[in-house]
Protein backbone atom coordinates (compact mmCIF):
# COMPACT_ATOMS: atom_id res chain seq x y z
CA UNK A 1 0.00 0.00 0.00
CA UNK A 2 1.48 3.30 -1.00
CA UNK A 3 1.56 6.33 1.20
CA UNK A 4 -0.91 8.18 -0.99
CA UNK A 5 -3.48 5.41 -0.76
CA UNK A 6 -3.16 5.22 3.00
CA UNK A 7 -3.71 9.00 3.29
CA UNK A 8 -6.93 8.77 1.24
CA UNK A 9 -8.22 6.08 3.55
CA UNK A 10 -7.52 8.22 6.61
CA UNK A 11 -9.37 11.25 5.29
CA UNK A 12 -12.85 11.68 6.74
CA UNK A 13 -15.62 10.75 4.34
CA UNK A 14 -17.25 13.68 2.52
CA UNK A 15 -20.14 15.28 4.38
CA UNK A 16 -23.37 13.51 3.52
CA UNK A 17 -26.60 15.34 2.95
CA UNK A 18 -29.13 14.43 5.64
CA UNK A 19 -31.48 11.68 4.51
CA UNK A 20 -34.42 13.00 6.51
CA UNK A 21 -36.20 16.06 5.16
CA UNK A 22 -36.19 19.15 7.36
CA UNK A 23 -38.93 19.35 9.95
CA UNK A 24 -42.25 19.95 8.24
CA UNK A 25 -44.36 22.97 9.03
CA UNK A 26 -47.53 21.96 10.86
CA UNK A 27 -50.33 20.99 8.51
CA UNK A 28 -52.98 22.79 10.56
CA UNK A 29 -53.23 26.55 10.14
CA UNK A 30 -52.77 28.69 13.24
CA UNK A 31 -55.68 28.75 15.63
CA UNK A 32 -58.66 30.37 13.94
CA UNK A 33 -60.44 33.28 15.61
CA UNK A 34 -63.67 32.24 17.32
CA UNK A 35 -66.63 31.85 15.01
CA UNK A 36 -69.01 34.79 14.74
CA UNK A 37 -71.98 34.56 17.08
CA UNK A 38 -75.03 33.10 15.37
CA UNK A 39 -77.30 35.71 13.87
CA UNK A 40 -80.65 36.33 15.47
CA UNK A 41 -83.34 34.04 14.15
CA UNK A 42 -85.92 36.80 14.51
CA UNK A 43 -85.46 40.52 13.99
CA UNK A 44 -84.91 42.49 17.14
CA UNK A 45 -88.04 44.10 18.60
CA UNK A 46 -88.48 47.85 18.15
CA UNK A 47 -87.01 49.90 21.01
CA UNK A 48 -90.46 51.03 22.18
CA UNK A 49 -91.22 47.51 23.35
CA UNK A 50 -88.62 47.92 26.10
CA UNK A 51 -90.74 50.40 28.06
CA UNK A 52 -94.23 49.87 26.69
CA UNK A 53 -96.18 46.70 27.20
CA UNK A 54 -99.61 45.54 28.19
CA UNK A 55 -98.98 46.97 31.67
CA UNK A 56 -98.55 50.45 30.19
CA UNK A 57 -101.57 50.28 27.92
CA UNK A 58 -100.04 48.38 25.05
CA UNK A 59 -98.09 49.78 22.12
CA UNK A 60 -98.41 49.75 18.41
CA UNK A 61 -95.51 48.66 16.28
CA UNK A 62 -92.90 51.17 15.17
CA UNK A 63 -94.68 51.36 11.80
CA UNK A 64 -97.61 52.94 13.60
CA UNK A 65 -95.42 55.59 15.17
CA UNK A 66 -94.57 53.69 18.34
CA UNK A 67 -97.61 55.05 20.17
CA UNK A 68 -99.47 53.53 23.04
CA UNK A 69 -103.07 52.57 22.87
CA UNK A 70 -105.37 54.12 25.39
CA UNK A 71 -104.75 52.69 28.86
CA UNK A 72 -108.53 52.42 29.28
CA UNK A 73 -109.54 48.96 28.17
CA UNK A 74 -111.87 49.15 25.17
CA UNK A 75 -115.33 47.71 25.63
CA UNK A 76 -115.86 44.26 24.18
CA UNK A 77 -117.76 44.69 20.94
CA UNK A 78 -118.71 42.38 18.14
CA UNK A 79 -117.15 44.68 15.56
CA UNK A 80 -113.43 44.67 16.23
CA UNK A 81 -111.41 47.53 14.81
CA UNK A 82 -107.91 46.84 13.45
CA UNK A 83 -105.19 47.79 15.89
CA UNK A 84 -103.55 50.18 13.42
CA UNK A 85 -106.59 52.50 13.61
CA UNK A 86 -105.73 53.21 17.25
CA UNK A 87 -102.18 54.26 16.43
CA UNK A 88 -100.84 57.68 15.69
CA UNK A 89 -98.68 58.41 12.72
CA UNK A 90 -94.95 58.69 13.23
CA UNK A 91 -94.08 61.85 15.14
CA UNK A 92 -97.72 62.74 15.69
CA UNK A 93 -98.95 63.93 19.06
CA UNK A 94 -102.61 63.92 18.15
CA UNK A 95 -105.17 61.55 19.50
CA UNK A 96 -106.58 58.99 17.13
CA UNK A 97 -109.27 56.49 17.98
CA UNK A 98 -109.15 57.33 21.68
CA UNK A 99 -105.44 56.55 22.02
CA UNK A 100 -102.99 58.86 23.73
CA UNK A 101 -99.75 59.40 21.87
CA UNK A 102 -96.45 61.05 22.53
CA UNK A 103 -94.27 62.89 20.07
CA UNK A 104 -91.45 60.70 18.83
CA UNK A 105 -89.05 63.57 19.55
CA UNK A 106 -89.99 63.58 23.25
CA UNK A 107 -88.84 60.39 24.92
CA UNK A 108 -89.12 57.15 23.03
CA UNK A 109 -92.52 57.88 21.55
CA UNK A 110 -94.48 55.75 23.99
CA UNK A 111 -96.55 56.35 27.09
CA UNK A 112 -96.90 55.02 30.60
CA UNK A 113 -100.30 53.84 31.76
CA UNK A 114 -100.53 57.10 33.71
CA UNK A 115 -100.31 58.96 30.39
CA UNK A 116 -96.76 60.31 30.64
CA UNK A 117 -94.19 59.65 27.96
CA UNK A 118 -91.33 57.27 28.54
Curated annotation (Swiss-Prot):
Pfam families: LCE. The lineage of its organism: Eukaryota, Metazoa, Chordata, Craniata, Vertebrata. InterPro entries: LCE. The keyword Magnesium does not apply. Residues 11-32 have a biased composition (Pro residues). Precursors of the cornified envelope of the stratum corneum. The gene is LCE5A. Disulfide bonds: none annotated. GO terms for molecular function: identical protein binding. Residues 72-82 have a biased composition (Basic residues). Signal peptide: none annotated. Belongs to the LCE family. Residues 1-32, 72-118 are annotated as: Disordered. This is Late cornified envelope protein 5A. GO terms for biological process: keratinization. Keywords: Keratinization. Belongs to the LCE cluster present on 1q21. Residues 1-10, 97-118 have a biased composition (Low complexity). It comes from the Eukaryota. Skin-specific. Expression was readily detected in adult trunk skin, adult arm skin, fetal skin, penal skin, vulva, esophagus and tongue. Not expressed in the cervix, rectum, lung, colon, or placenta. Expression is observed in the heart. Interacts with CYSRT1; the interaction is direct.
Amino acid sequence: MSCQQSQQQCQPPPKCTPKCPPKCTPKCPPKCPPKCPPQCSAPCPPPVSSCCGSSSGGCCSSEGGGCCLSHHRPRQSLRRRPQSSSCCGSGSGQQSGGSSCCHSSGGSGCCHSSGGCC
